[in-house]
Amino acid sequence: MFASPGPELFQFGPFVLRWYGLLIAAAVLIGLNLSSSLAQQRKLENGLISDLLPLLVLFSVIGARIYYVAFEWHNYAATPLKALAIWEGGIAIHGALIAGTLTLILFCRWRQQSFWDVLDVLVPSVALGQSIGRWGNFFNSEAFGIPTDLPWKLFIPEQNRPIIYVNQEFFHPTFLYESLWNLALFIILILLFRWGSKHLNKLPAGAMSCIYLMGYSLGRVWIEGLRIDSLCIGALPPACEGGLRIAQLMSGVMALAGSLGLWWLYGRKKPLPDPGFRPN
């Protein structure tokens, strides 16, 4: 059994340093250094990642917020300006992935880079960043699962529990499941990258990205089924009974896209269509 020490690392006057913000900043810095190193190994343009990352982070956060608010509009319709209060919580990773992808496409067209070449050096950092960032959910006592009595159960303070579970104290630490899953995915992607650097003809452009899509999505489908705060269509959390969990739907689409991409690369032995710029 374990429990969060609280969302704040320390406070100095009006300044409050929150664990979540610190973890996100750490993930961005680690991702910048790792992706820059991988880009250098793949001989991409110098400074490409450092130019790209601020745009990716900015628009991914905006996309994550818009996505969340769109599916939770019933909570914002009366006070639309609350949609801007991102510090109060409420972002969704699939919104970040959609916005990040669109940003990357436009960036690659601007800088005349192959979309898949750039994405392949980013996805290990994305997986690692997700693994790190999920610990922010731990400190905030959020994004947890259904009640459980397993040895690794997570204590949730009463004020953070849904009403129907107010008498339950211990829940599945779904943040931990996803953090470990993404860490394992990161290790697999790094090993594949190193192997692919020695066997370029066996790991074509886009293969790493497709493996990330499949790997992350399969884990998310399983973990999302345990969560009690899912965005839903046709029902309301925490149960989502009779409704559809949006994250599971999106993850299913992403897993299908990744598998089709691998089939295209290895089954048809053709390069993936590049939405960015493919040099001659």
UniProtKB/Swiss-Prot annotation:
An example Gene Ontology biological process: lipoprotein biosynthetic process
Keyword hit for Cell inner membrane: yes
GO cellular component assignments: plasma membrane
Alphabetized GO MF terms: phosphatidylglycerol-prolipoprotein diacylglyceryl transferase activity
Subcellular location: Cell inner membrane
Membrane-crossing residue ranges in chain numbering: 12-32, 52-72, 86-106, 115-133, 173-193, 203-223, 246-266
Domain of life where this protein originates: Bacteria
InterPro entries assigned: Lgt
Key word Magnesium present: no
Pathway where this protein functions: Protein modification; lipoprotein biosynthesis (diacylglyceryl transfer)
Binding-site list for a 1,2-diacyl-sn-glycero-3-phospho-(1'-sn-glycerol): 134
PROSITE patterns attached to this UniProt entry: LGT (PS01311)
Membrane topology (UniProt): Multi-pass membrane protein
Annotated family: Belongs to the Lgt family.
Function: Catalyzes the transfer of the diacylglyceryl group from phosphatidylglycerol to the sulfhydryl group of the N-terminal cysteine of a prolipoprotein, the first step in the formation of mature lipoproteins.
Protein name: Phosphatidylglycerol--prolipoprotein diacylglyceryl transferase
Organism: Synechococcus sp. (strain CC9902)
